[in-house]
Amino acid sequence: MSIEHQSYVEPLGVKGKVILTSFLGLDANNIFQQNIFLNQLSNFVNLNCSTVVSLVEDSEFDQLCEKKLFVRNIYNHNLKWIHMPIADLKAPDHEFKKKWITTKTLLKNDLLKGNNIVLHCKGGIGRSGTVAALILIEHGEENANAIKCVRKKRQGAIENELQEQFVLDYRTIS
C-alpha cells in the first residue's frame, strides 16, 4: 500500500509525513485482529515510518488488546513507540504538555530525516487530528490553517470545540 492510500499531513520544510489512523489492528467490527495489526506494521515499515505514537489511554488498551503484545510487535518491526495518552474527546492535559516538550523534538528529528510517523487514537480523528495539527504548527504552519490542513486530509478531524480551541491557543516553545 502506498502513502497515498493513507490519511496524512505534510509539515512545512521536511520530507517526512504524519499518518493519522485509528487503533491499529481493528477489523470492521472494531475487534483487534493480530494478523491485521502485523500487516499494518509491515506496511508502515514499507512506507518508511520510524515511530508509532499511541494517543489512547491504558483503559482503552485494556478494552482492545494486550498492551505488552501491542508494544512488543511494534518493536519487533524496528519501529519506535511513544505513548502520549489523551482522554477520548478531550484536549491534551498537563501531563501530555510536559511530555510533549521532549517528544515533539524526537518527532521533528524523524521528520527532518525524511521518516514518516504514525499517530493513532481509537478512531483516528479527534486526538490524532489534534496532535497532527500541533506538529504542523511546530513546523511553521499558522494555527487555524493547521486545522484546515488536517481536516482536508482527514474528514471530521479535531472533532470538537475543546480540541479545536486547544490547537488555536497552542504556542510553540523551544
Please identify what each model-predicted range represents.
Residues 1-118, 130-174:
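Cys-dependent protein tyrosine phosphatase-like superfamily
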Residues 124:
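Conserved G/P- and acidic residue-centered "switch" motifs that form tight phosphate/ATP-binding loops
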Residues 127:
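Conserved SAM/SAH-binding loop-helix junction
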Residues 121:
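Short cysteine clusters
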